[in-house]
Each structure stands twice: as C-alpha cells, then as structure tokens.
C-alpha cells in the first residue's frame, strides 16, 4: 500500500513576485504549507502552516488548482501527495520571521521562475502551467 498525505498551503503573490521558502533539507524553493491534521480544514491548515513556517498571518482569497504527486519531491519516496493551493495575502508583510528548519524566505520573480532561473518544486511549475500564478 502506498502512503498518502494531504497538504495545504498558501500562494502569496505581490507585484509579480511569489513568496517562497527553502528548508535545510531541500535544494529547491517551494511554497509554504504542510500536512492537514486531524479535524482540520484545508483553509485552517493553510493558515497554521504559514504561521509555523514564517510567523505571519494570512487572508485566504480563493482556492487554486490541486496537484496529485506520486512521489515525494524531497525524498523521492513513492507515495500519493494531494497538494491544495490557496491564493492568499499576508495580513502584515513586515512580520516575517523564518522558523527552523526554514533557512530562507524569498520573493521570486514569476518571470524568472518561468525562465527557469530558479529550481522550484513541481507544484510551482504546475500552478504556472494552470495559469494560477499571475
């Protein structure tokens, strides 16, 4: 039987740039987010994860595309990962403090992501293809 997890996270875009994080274990940029806990909605997970990872609070604006992966992009372990994305904005953009294991929080230009200047997670590429990142 294949392991299965459901993940939810915010997509924060401002002035043509995407808010991303990089963890110690990763060699790519990714969106904040994480596993849905028992009795938690996808939206609640989204808000909790951003607070845990960068110390900020968000306002969820709309649901974006969902991506199903068959492999963990970090460990390459075969598993089913259901990634739910929500367009969101930070309530107070100045209150950003990375929390371990987050080693970097950055704004990446969508144009540079499209031109593959950065190594990013599969869901960022997917959201670009779906037209969700504008």
PLM segments and residue spans:
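Conserved N-terminal beta-strand and adjoining loop/helix that marks the start
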Residues: 1-18, 84
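Short secondary-structure boundary/capping segments
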Residues: 2, 10-11, 75-78, 96-98, ...
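Conserved hydrophobic "DFG−1" position in protein kinase catalytic cores
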Residues: 12-13, 20, 88, 107
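Conserved Nudix-box catalytic region and its N-terminal flanking loop in Nudix hydrolases
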Residues: 14-52, 56
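Nudix hydrolase/Nudix homology domain
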Residues: 27-29, 95-134
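Hydrophobic pocket-lining residues within nucleotide cofactor-binding pockets
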Residues: 36, 67, 90, 110-113
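A short coil-to-beta-strand element that immediately follows conserved catalytic motifs
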Residues: 57-66
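Active-site-adjacent beta-strand/loop module that shapes the phosphate/pyrophosphate-binding cleft
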Residues: 68-95, 106
């Amino acid at each position: 039987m294949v392991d299965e997890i459901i993940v939810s996270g915010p997509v924060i875009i401002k002035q043509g740039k995407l808010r991303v994080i990089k963890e110690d274990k990763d060699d790519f940029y990714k969106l904040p987010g994480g596993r849905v806990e028992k009795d938690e909605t996808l939206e609640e997970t989204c808000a909790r994860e951003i607070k845990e990872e960068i110390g900020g609070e968000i306002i969820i604006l709309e649901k974006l595309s969902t991506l199903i992966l068959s492999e963990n992009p970090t460990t390459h372990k075969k598993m089913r990962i259901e990634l739910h994305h929500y367009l969101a904005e930070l309530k107070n953009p100045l209150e950003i403090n990375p929390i371990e294991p987050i080693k970097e929080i950055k704004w990446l230009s969508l144009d540079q992501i499209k031109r593959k200047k950065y190594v990013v997670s599969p869901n960022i590429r997917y959201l670009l293809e779906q037209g969700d990142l504008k």
